UniProtKB/Swiss-Prot annotation:
Low complexity composition-biased segments: 612-654
Self-association state and partner proteins as the record states: Interacts (via C-terminus) with CSNK2A2.
Disulfide bonds: none
Name of the protein: Casein kinase II subunit alpha'-interacting protein
Residue ranges that the Swiss-Prot or TrEMBL entry lists as coiled coil: none
Record note on modification: Phosphorylated by CK2 (casein kinase II), specifically by complexes containing catalytic subunit CSNK2A2.
Length: 734
């Protein structure tokens, strides 16, 4: 009879899978000389409350070790055909998804080519709660004496305890040939049935290759009959299938389980029986020396001391409703492996072929479906500790870097190089000292450092203190202190009590590391030149000079200072008085000439500046100035004859006429243009020459030039005035 396997939705003969798996496995020949050693080399013993059989599937891409699972010849005749029928109809295993073309859970044994072995195959069922015959198990028994020597017998049931220990003894073969270790099928997106299983693999010596086998354990009640043993196990299997199946989440990383280096007659893997009321808490006890779990995606390589077994993504230790405690007691160096994979195992690097990661044995937890999952508290604690340490390290490095940068800078202090300089007036020394002491050095240094910082932020090349750096402070002279809050003395922008203290540091520090600071106190209202104004001359001025001339001089005084340097640059400021574009030629110099006459008059006789001088000196100065003014005005008045002009010498026109005539723009131009310097005469020569007489030829040239250009301008101005008058009359009538 050809055994069948459930593949997809069809039943496929198992010979097809034999051919697939045999292509990926190595055929091994074992000498018959070592067959008699299996009684002296017990490998493992497992006891459990569960009565279910489960074998992890073998990987299709790995080396498959075929092993035979056969009952002993003593108990073989006791298995009835009815038991086989009941066992075939019992749904034991369940798988939801099967992506690989390999069969689910089956064992294969590699025998000699001349011998045939018993093949028992456990198949998956598609549905979990179905009661149909989902398991097809066929066994072809050919009793051969050589084959029976390789079969693993059952142990006798133990009547002293409440369970039957089924011991499977594996062979330990001494061979220098390469024997493939037992590997497991990889479960891809499958649900493992609720079974208690421990898959152990062992290797013997550095030159010994051992065959690993699965260890199954069933625990029925006390009985001497194997038939009743099998029937009770089938009933418990049906009850266990009614409970929800356990889910095994496959992880993305491959885990190689290192099998312990067993020596014959030294190790027994025991699991004592406990009360059913105990919790399901698997405890893994081992020596402090714990072997590592190398993580890699490559194939398991055979080492001198141990085998790397590549199981499915995890080797679960499942539990059913029956409560038990598994304890692995090891008296030697063993590998401490967790029961199930945690979710954090997918973070292991796939390139760590020779890398060893030490994984502790956490206390597993049971989820809702009853599956045992390893606790990931230790992993999360390690991850949290590593992240916390990294954050603390980065924070400390971040806090340390500004300190190192600040230490590179040379600490500097302030030092007043000289007494405070007062500009714009005179202030008592006591007030200046109080003002300087009211501002602390730390405040000045902080403000200068801020400016240095702003320069660095803008990317400027010179962050050091220099002449461009300065800090200004508002100072009240009445309070004699710096203003930190509003002061009652300061009202308005122009206040005589307000002053500004400027602190200007030197570019570099001296040898002592101190930066000298220059203090400058600038008054808001500097000393005005009110004494130079010609207001006292108003009373002593003759009638030939009109009052409107003085008003024009006052207006010019507001725009032009008294220094000679500013007088030289008056040509650049002549556009201020050019009212219309056609009047630029005429209005370039008159506004400055009025001021020059005034300066010349003051420089010729400085006694006229004082109002308390004698009347004779003032009258002589006024007569001399009036004569020069009259001579210049006669020339200019003769040259400027138009409808809009008026005679300066006429004293009958009071200031009322000036107010009415200044409303029109050309009239204002004529007020300022009655003084003219001849061509070729500089202003400085005119000012410093006391008895300067105008040459008759030079005014003629200017007169001829002015006569050529005047008619056009006069026509334009008359037309403009007429047009303005007509528009004014038009709007007035309406």
């Amino acid at each position: 009879m050809v055994p069948l396997a459930y593949y997809g939705q069809h039943f496929v003969p198992l010979d097809y899978f034999y051919q697939l798996s045999s292509a990926n496995t190595l055929t091994h020949q074992h000498t018959g000389e070592k067959l008699n050693q299996f009684n002296n080399q017990p490998m493992a013993k497992v006891q459990s409350h569960s009565n279910h059989f489960a074998v992890p599937p073998l990987g299709s891409n790995k080396k498959v070790q075929r092993c035979s699972v056969l009952p002993s010849p003593k108990s073989q005749d006791k298995i009835s055909q009815s038991f086989c029928d009941r066992f075939l109809n019992s749904p034991l295993f369940h798988a939801k998804h099967q992506n690989t073309p390999s069969i689910g859970l089956h064992w294969r044994s590699s025998l000699w080519p001349a011998q045939r072995a018993l093949n028992s195959h456990l198949l998956h069922s598609k549905a979990q709660t179905t009661s149909s015959s989902d398991l097809n198990m066929t066994s072809s028994l050919e009793l051969n004496q050589a084959a029976l020597s390789l079969q693993l017998p059952f142990c006798k049931p133990q009547t002293t305890s409440s369970s039957l220990d089924v011991c499977w003894r594996s062979l330990s073969l001494k061979s220098h040939q390469r024997v493939s270790s037992s590997s497991l099928f990889r479960l891809q997106n499958q649900e493992i049935p609720s079974i208690n299983i421990i898959w152990t693999s062992s290797s013997l010596g550095p030159k010994r290759k051992a065959l690993s086998s699965t260890l199954l354990q069933s625990k029925p009640q006390k009985t001497s009959s194997l038939d009743y043993l099998w029937t009770s196990s089938l009933q418990r299997n049906q009850r266990s299938l009614s409970s929800p199946s356990l889910n095994t989440k496959l992880q993305t990383s491959d885990l190689f389980w290192t099998s312990p280096s067993f020596k014959p007659n030294q190790i027994a893997l025991t699991s004592p029986l406990l009360d059913s009321r105990l919790q399901k808490t698997p405890i893994l006890n081992s020596n402090p020396t714990i072997g590592g779990l190398p993580v890699s995606h490559s194939k398991a390589r055979q080492s001198a001391s141990s085998y790397f077994v590549h199981p499915s993504e995890n080797l679960p230790l499942f539990q059913l409703n029956s409560q038990s405690m598994f304890m692995l007691d090891c008296n030697f160096q063993t590998t401490n492996s967790p029961v199930c994979h945690s979710k954090f195992q997918n973070t292991t690097s796939p390139n760590g072929k020779h890398r060893v990661t030490h994984l502790p044995s956490p206390h597993p937890k049971t989820n809702i479906s009853g599956q045992l999952l390893s606790s990931s508290k230790h992993c999360t604690r390690n991850t949290a500790a590593s992240t916390l340490g990294f954050r603390l390290q980065s924070k400390s490095s971040f806090q340390f870097s500004p300190k190192t940068e600040s230490n590179k800078e040379i600490p500097w202090t302030l030092k007043y190089s000289q007494p405070c300089i007062v500009k714009g007036g005179t202030v008592p020394d006591d007030v200046v000292n109080k003002i300087v002491n009211s501002i602390s050095n730390t405040r000045i240094q902080r403000d200068l450092c801020r400016q240095i910082l702003f320069r660095r932020m803008r990317g400027r090349p010179n962050p050091h203190p220099g002449p461009r750096l300065s800090s200004n402070y508002v100072v009240c002279l009445a309070c004699a202190s710096c203003l930190k809050s509003p002061c009652n003395h300061l009202r308005g922008k122009k206040n005589p009590h307000c002053a500004t203290l400027s602190v200007i540091p030197t570019p570099e520090a001296n040898s002592e590391g101190k930066i000298e600071v220059k203090l400058v106190l600038i008054l808001s209202l500097p000393e005005t030149f009110s004494s130079c104004l010609p207001f006292p001359m108003k009373e002593n001025q003759p009638n030939e000079v009109p009052e409107d001339n003085l008003e024009g001089v006052e207006k010019i005084q507001q725009f032009f200072p008294t220094s000679e340097r500013d007088i030289q640059g008056l040509n650049m400021k002549q556009i201020w008085w050019a009212v219309a574009p056609e009047n630029k030629v005429i209005g370039q110099q008159p506004q400055a000439i009025d001021w020059l006459f005034y300066v010349k008059k003051n420089n010729s006789q400085p006694q006229s500046l004082l109002p308390s001088t004698s009347s004779s000196t003032s009258s002589s100065s006024t007569t001399s100035s009036s004569s020069s003014v009259a001579s210049a005005s006669s020339d200019s008045s003769s040259s400027s004859s138009s409808s809009s002009s008026f005679s300066i010498s006429s004293s009958s026109s009071p200031s009322k006429e000036f107010m009415t005539l200044t409303l029109s723009r050309p009239v204002f131009r004529k007020v300022l243009s009655y003084h003219r310097l001849p061509a070729g005469v500089s202003w400085l020569e005119f000012i410093y020459s006391k008895d300067y007489q105008l040459h008759p030829r030079k005014p003629n040239r200017s007169q001829s030039s002015s006569l050529k250009t005047k008619p056009v301008r006069n026509n334009n101005t008359v037309k403009w005035r007429k047009g303005a008058n007509t528009l004014f009359k038009f709007f007035r009538t309406k």
